[in-house]
Every structure is written in C-alpha cells, then in structure tokens.
C-alpha cells in the first residue's frame, strides 16, 4: 500500500510542478521526477544505489586523516633542505585540488544542481570528492550504525569538519587523501575485476606481511630491502601506483550505474527495468540510443587511446607527478635509508589556477593553524599550474597571403594558425562544464592600432565574443530533444546555456584537440562514439588509419582598411579558462530560481553547523557567484576575479618578413 501512495505522491508532485513552473522548466523537472521514480528502490532503502561497485563503507580499518598521521613524517621538518616544500609529499599534496576537492565552492554549487535534478545523486559525486567521508559512512551509506538521512548525506551535510579546519581526525574535508590513495588495489580482495571510472575503488582493508607498524597496508612504488629500516606502518610494494589506471578511478566519469531490487520494484512500476544500468545513455544527434553510459569525462580513456599509452608509456604520473630534480629530495623527514634524489612529486597540478586562489583566500588562515603552511602550498600549486599550461600546446602563426593597402584601396590578409596538443589527453580535458580554451587573434598596424580581432575577451564581464572565425575548444553536452526539436539541446527556453551534469544524454559539440596518436574507436566501441570529436572535424593522419591529427589549423581572412600604416603584425594567443561566465551564472540562477536553501539551513543538523566560513546564510550557487563577481576589496564578500583566463602560448608574424 505504501508503494501505491508513493506513486500517487510522485504523480501529484509532477502535476503541481508542471502547473506552476515555466513550460521548459516544468518539462525538465517532470521528466526528471518520472525518470527517478522509475529507479527508486523499494521501501527500506528509500534511495537509488548510485554507487553499487567496489569497496563499500564499513571498513575494518578507518581511512586515517592526513594530519598528523601522514604529515608527521611526510611534510617539512626542522633541518630539512630549503627546497623541501617543492618535493615533500604532504606539503605538495596539501596545496593541490586533490587535497581540496571537498573545499571547492564550484563543486558544491554544481552538487546542489545535480541533487535537484536527480535526488540523491550526490552520493556518486562525493565518492571521489571525499573518499574518506564516503568510506567512513558520512555520506548516504552508513559505515556502521543507523541509516543516514540520504538527502542530507548526498548534499555533504553529514561530513565532519569545516572548510577551514585542518585535515585531522575530526574532518572529512581533506579531499582525496594519502591514506585513500595508498590503500588502492587494482582488483578486489577476492580477485574481482578492477574499475577505471566513477570512483569505483577497491581499498585494501587487511594486514599485510610487512608488519612494521600499524595496519592496514600502505601501498606504493617502493620496497624496503632486508636490513633497512622499515616505516612505522605496514607497507606493500605496488606497481599499480605507477600506472595510469589508478588515476582512471576518478578521471573517467560516466553516468552513474544505478542499482535497485528489481523483483519488488518491477511489480510496482511494470517497466521491465532489470535492476541496474546507466542512469543516462548516450544519444546521437539523430536520437539513436547507443546504449553506452553517457561519457561525462574521459581523461583516462583519451590517454589510453593515444600514443602516450603505447610502449614506452608516458603515464599520467610522468606529467602530473614529475620526478624532482633536487638531489636532496626525500619523501620522509626522517630520511631513513639515505634514499634521496629523484622522487615523484605529489603535485597533481592541471590547468586550474583560479579555485586554489579562492581556497587560499577563503580558508587559508584556518588551514594554516596546524603549522603546515597550507597557503604557501596553495600558491605553489597555482604557480606550477601556470607553468604546466605553458607546456600543454605549441602555437605557430603564418601569413598565407598579403595584399598591402594603399591610401585609397583596402588590402587583404590571410592567416594560418596551428595549435598542437602536446598533452596525453584532449586539450582541454576533464570536467566539461564551463571549461574552455580559445585562440585570440589580433592584427595591429605599425603604430599598434587594432586592425582586426577574433575571439575578443572582456575581463570586466568575462564575455567571449564568438565571431564567425573564432576558434573555441570545448565540449558542450546537453539533453536530446529537450525542446522537441529532435536535436541535442544545450540551451533553456531563454536561450541561456544549461548545465545539467547528471541529466545530459548527448554531445552537441566536442571541438577539443585530440592527443598524439588518438584513435577513438575501440573493440568495445568500434564507432568511437564515446571519444570522437563532435561537430568539429579533425582529419585522420592518413586515409583509413583511424588515427586523428593532434592539431587544429585555423584560417582567418580579413580586409585591411585603406590607409593603414604598415607593416602589420598578427599575434595569436592561446587562453585557458576554468569557468565561463555562463556556467557561473547558471549555477547562481538555478539556486535562486529553484529555491535552493542556504547552506547552513540545508545542513542545519549536520556536524559543526552552523559554519562561519563558506556560503553560510547564502546558497552555494549565490556564494560561488559572489566569489566570481565581487571586487577583491568588497567588505562583505571579497571576489577573486571572473576566472581570469590563463595565457598558454603566444605566436606572431609580421608582414615585414612576408
């Protein structure tokens, strides 16, 4: 009887939402509620299982916090070399977005949208953003004891700690922690196959043979020979920690694989649903359903299908954990066994320079109270990220043709600009929403006057002008047939871009530049649907090879006004941006228009509430918008710039040498 009431209740909710919301929004909400109702577990769980695979909460050995369990030996200590902040594991990790994945305000604003779109799906998001909190039973699934409130859990309201508190035993805010990564296994405890997506991790939860100290095993790419001093904890050599597959655990993301008890639910819904499968599957532009789980992020797979995955491999770690060149580099402050020199630095930097600065400004003072110099580490991450971005691409500008202007007759110019991807994945890669890279092209006269510009950017509004010749590299995912147009729709009824991460089921455009040797087709996906460019042609290196070029050649034609002072200089600049204006504005608008609660109200009965840092009495979306929009000296809420674009490369050519 209670199932029947639940169905009636859901139907009533859909009807009310459709009656009172705008047509487009009602369609989205109603469709979402219907989709969710078709996947609800029977009474007793009350939620969909978005995380059915891998090690589950309820460990024999807790995931220990980084402070002081790891920092005591693996951070800076008295007498260490002055370069120690550049290589000591805890110190370098603590400034990374890995370490601060549970402090990222952009993530939390997006989390609220996801939970609104598909109630409870935050469980799937938080598995990678707070693996300690998830495995300790502080999200949706309890570790031990009474059930969690699934709504509060999926919204991260049950996590211990605060955004500005040290990563100690009282905090789940330490992101992807040392103890989590160094307990990862390639297979399950009984030989179950491993996973390379969605945080479906196998975590070592046993004692091992090297019982030098406290259990459980800490796994890593080092061994201790007989007669040498072991660490004060159990250890085991792990080849897995040198392989890219370990990164694929969270850097391949598909629409969640949901699970329920089909025998009971099918009697209720009669939909023939078999109990598990992807929440959303990828549809082609004509509506054909591929049956593939929607490929949300594919950084690991992009690498896997590139030349970098071929022998001799260049792994993720080679670029994102580069070996220190300092002869004094050590992993441990005790410096036992005299192991120094080349050491994989736990830098984990990518292209994100903006959010580490926000975390530094918003939470740095509190994080520094433990004496770990967190603000220094965050700044180091920003600096390293900028440096890495300059190595990600090559840029070459060529004047293909030029007709000089005269005092009375206009001239003409044709440019060719080649952008080559030097990374082991698409450029840009990873989280699709808001990320973009573009070519800004300017032609100036002999006096520096602007003659022509493509992809002009206004830093005061963060508006990127997308003129007909503009080159913007991004992936735009959407909802197929959302407006009844029979296409992949990426805008709402107001012609504003929408970002419904967990509802997307199609790719309208993927213009990102492939890596070297990139072959999108695989045995499991012979058409390359998951990885191929969409709406933007990248030719094969040779006809029929199946391998795409790793560069884009952009051409520009322009008229030069009569009387322009020559020679002319054409300059190309390649920029990267973490979050576009329309993404941040969408997060704010969703929070306001959908009536999201402010964070302290939403999490009112959670640990350590109310918070005195972060959103507090604001919604997470509005807080994110203020961080993006406000002036740096705003007395109420300082801003940190509108995700300022980072200059990656520049290249120029002059008519004086043409």
Question: Which residues does each predicted region cover?
Answer:
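Bacterial N-terminal signal peptides that target proteins for export
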Residues: 2-12
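Bacterial N-terminal signal peptides
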Residues: 10-20
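Boundary at the C-terminal end of the N-terminal hydrophobic targeting segment
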Residues: 24-26
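Primarily the internal scaffold of c-type cytochrome electron-transfer domains
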Residues: 28-52, 79-111, 142-511, 516-538, ...
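Local sequence-structure signature of Cys/Sec-based thiol-disulfide redox active-site neighborhoods
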Residues: 53-72, 119-122
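N-terminal catalytic scaffold of extracellular/periplasmic and nuclease hydrolases
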Residues: 107-125, 134-137
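Conserved, well-structured interaction surfaces
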Residues: 127, 131-139, 149, 156
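Extracellular Ig-like/FN3 beta-sandwich strand-entry sites
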Residues: 565-567
């Amino acid at each position: 009887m209670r199932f029947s009431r639940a169905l009636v209740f859901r139907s009533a909710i859909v009807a009310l939402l459709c009656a009172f919301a705008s047509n487009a929004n009602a369609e989205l909400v109603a469709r979402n509620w219907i989709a969710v109702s078709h996947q609800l577990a029977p009474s007793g769980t009350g939620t969909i299982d978005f995380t059915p695979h891998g090690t589950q909460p309820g460990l024999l050995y807790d995931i220990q916090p980084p402070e002081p369990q790891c920092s005591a030996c693996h951070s800076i200590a008295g007498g260490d070399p002055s370069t120690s902040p550049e290589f000591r594991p805890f110190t370098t990790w603590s400034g990374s977005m890995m370490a601060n994945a549970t402090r990222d305000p952009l993530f939390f604003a997006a989390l609220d949208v996801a939970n609104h779109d598909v109630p409870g799906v935050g469980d799937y998001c938080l598995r990678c953003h707070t693996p300690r909190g998830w495995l300790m039973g502080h999200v949706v699934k309890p570790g031990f004891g009474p059930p969690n409130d699934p709504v509060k859990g999926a919204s991260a309201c049950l996590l211990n700690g605060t955004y500005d508190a040290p990563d100690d035993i009282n905090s789940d805010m330490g992101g992807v922690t040392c103890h989590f990564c160094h307990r990862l296994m390639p297979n399950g405890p009984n030989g179950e196959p491993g996973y390379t997506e969605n945080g479906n991790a196998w975590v070592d939860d046993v004692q091992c043979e090297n019982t030098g100290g406290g259990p459980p095993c800490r796994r890593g790419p080092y061994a201790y020979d007989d007669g040498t001093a072991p660490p004060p904890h159990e250890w085991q050599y792990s080849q897995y920690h040198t392989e890219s597959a370990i990164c694929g655990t969270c850097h391949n993301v598909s629409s969640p694989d949901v699970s329920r008890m089909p025998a009971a639910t099918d009697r209720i819904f009669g939909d023939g649903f078999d109990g598990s499968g992807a929440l959303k599957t990828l549809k082609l532009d004509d509506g054909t359903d591929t049956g593939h789980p929607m490929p949300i992020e594919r950084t690991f797979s992009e690498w896997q299908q590139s030349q970098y995955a071929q022998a001799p491999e260049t792994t993720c770690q080679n670029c994102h954990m580069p070996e220190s060149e300092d002869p004094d580099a050590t992993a441990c402050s005790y410096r036992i066994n005299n192991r120094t020199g080349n050491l994989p630095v736990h830098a984990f930097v990518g292209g994100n320079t903006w959010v580490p600065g926000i975390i530094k400004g918003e939470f740095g003072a509190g994080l520094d109270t433990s004496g770990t110099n967190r603000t220094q580490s965050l700044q180091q991450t920003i600096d390293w990220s900028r440096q890495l971005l300059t190595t990600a691409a090559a840029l070459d500008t060529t004047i293909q043709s030029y007709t000089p202007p005269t005092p009375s007759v206009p001239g003409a110019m044709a440019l060719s600009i080649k952008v080559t991807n030097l990374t082991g994945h698409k450029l840009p890669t990873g989280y699709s929403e808001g990320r973009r890279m573009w070519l800004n092209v300017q032609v100036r006269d002999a006096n520096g006057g602007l003659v022509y510009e493509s992809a002009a950017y206004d830093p005061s509004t963060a508006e990127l002008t997308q003129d007909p010749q503009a080159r913007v590299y991004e992936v735009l995912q959407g909802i197929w047939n959302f407006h009844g147009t029979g296409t992949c729709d990426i805008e709402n009824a107001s012609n504003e871009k929408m970002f419904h991460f967990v509802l997307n089921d199609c790719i309208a455009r993927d213009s990102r530049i492939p890596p070297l040797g990139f072959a999108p087709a695989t045995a499991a996906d012979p058409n390359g649907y998951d990885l191929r460019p969409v709406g933007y042609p990248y030719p094969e290196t040779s006809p029929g090879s199946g391998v795409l070029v790793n560069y884009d050649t952009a051409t520009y034609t322009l008229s030069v006004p009569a009387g322009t002072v020559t020679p002319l200089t054409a300059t190309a600049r390649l920029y990267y941006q973490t979050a576009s204006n329309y993404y941040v504005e969408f997060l704010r608008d969703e929070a306001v228009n959908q009536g999201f609660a402010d964070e302290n109200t939403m999490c009112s009965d959670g640990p350590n509430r109310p918070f005195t840092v972060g959103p507090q009495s604001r919604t997470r979306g509005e807080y994110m918008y203020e961080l993006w929009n406000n002036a740096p000296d705003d007395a109420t809420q300082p801003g940190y710039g509108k995700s300022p674009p980072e200059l990656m490369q520049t290249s120029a050519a002059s008519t004086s040498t043409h």
